[in-house]
Each structure stands twice: as C-alpha cells, then as structure tokens.
Amino acid sequence: MDYYSTQISKLIEELGRLPGIGAKSAQRLAFHIINMPKEQVEHLAKTMLDARSNVKYCKVCQTLTDKEICPICSSEKRDQKVIMVVENTRDLAAYEKTGKFDGVYHVLHGAISPMLGIGPQDIKLKELMLRLQGDVDEVIIATNSSLEGEATAMYISKLIKPAGIKVSRIASGVPVGGDLEYIDEVTLLRALDGRIQL
C-alpha cells in the first residue's frame, strides 16, 4: 500500500536515484524539501540547474569547473611539471585539503573496470596522454586502492614509461578498497610522501 501522494512518491523516487541516498534518506530529504519555504526550494532548484548548465571540464586537467581553465591549472604558483592523476574531482579536493601538493592534477572521471564494461577509452586517458607531450617530469598515480584503481594505475604506468617520464604511485596507508575522498589529510600526506616509482 502506498502511503504517500503521487507527487511525494515521485520526489522520493527521484531523490533515491542519487548515489549514496537510500530509501530512508530519500524519504527524509523529500519531507524536508516539502516543508521548506517555497523561495528556498526555488533557490535550490535554480542552483542545481545553474550548476548543471555552467559546470564543465577544465580544458587542461578535466576537473569540474565553471571556467575554461580551472584555478589550479591557471595558477603560476603550481608546478606544471608534476601531474597527479586521480579518479574524480572529489579525490582532487581531498588532496587539496592537505595544502601540501603544489603540482597539478589530471582527473580521469572513472577507473578501468572490465566487470562494469569500462575500458581505457571510457575515461580521460587520451587527454592525459596529450598533456604528457608537453614538459612533464613526473606523473603521480593516485587512483583508489581498489581492484579498478590498481588496474588503472598499472595501465597508465605501462603507457607512460616508454616516454621516459618518471611514474610513481602513492604509497599504501590508504586502505585497499578505500575511496580517497574519505581519507584524512595525514594519511593522504603519508601516502603521497611514501609514493613508489613504477
């Protein structure tokens, strides 16, 4: 038996499609939104639509930004010769929180996963290889320590080594299967400082 009106059920269903939002969370969010003042709901909806319309990939590193080139890539204070490769923008943000990495990033927007049908052509590897034609000294591979992250790291390493560019992998300390965005800054720093050459 459906206890909610059609509109409430639709809202719960749509919110439940978001990653990390289960049925109970979707229900809580739906009722919170329904009880918000109309102006706040309109502002929330407009903010979401604006973000969807205006956020794009940085032309250099592929992170999400509202500019053609993100602030990190356009900063003269960053070492453009050292590129850290991460799976997503959340991982980039996790390293930025440490305040210790002064290089630049490349965001893959995924990891190789044959089980899910995700191959090298489905992530931003082509863009990375184009960047490496420039003046690059080191590529630090900071993919997650999951099977997919490890497979992606090995694939990237094999692609880059023939170019004579130093390739390193962040050290463990990041638990196997752990997502970087949930790791504290100290652990991330230790992983970065203890990286190994591949």
UniProtKB/Swiss-Prot annotation:
Toprim domain ranges (all copies): 81-175
InterPro entries the UniProt entry points to: DNA_Rcmb_RecR, Rcmb_RecR, Rcmb_RecR_Znf, TOPRIM_dom, TOPRIM_RecR
GO molecular function: DNA binding; zinc ion binding
Listed SMART domains: TOPRIM
Zinc finger region(s), C4-type: 58-73
Keywords: DNA damage, DNA recombination, DNA repair, Metal-binding, Zinc, Zinc-finger
PROSITE patterns: RECR (PS01300), TOPRIM (PS50880)
Biological process, per Gene Ontology: DNA recombination; DNA repair
Any Pfam family matching the protein: RecR_ZnF
Keyword Chaperone set for record: no
Domain of life: Bacteria
Family the UniProt entry places it in: Belongs to the RecR family.
Physiological role: May play a role in DNA repair. It seems to be involved in an RecBC-independent recombinational process of DNA repair. It may act with RecF and RecO.
NCBIfam families membership: recR (TIGR00615)
Name listed for the protein in its UniProt record: Recombination protein RecR
Gene transcribed to yield this protein: recR
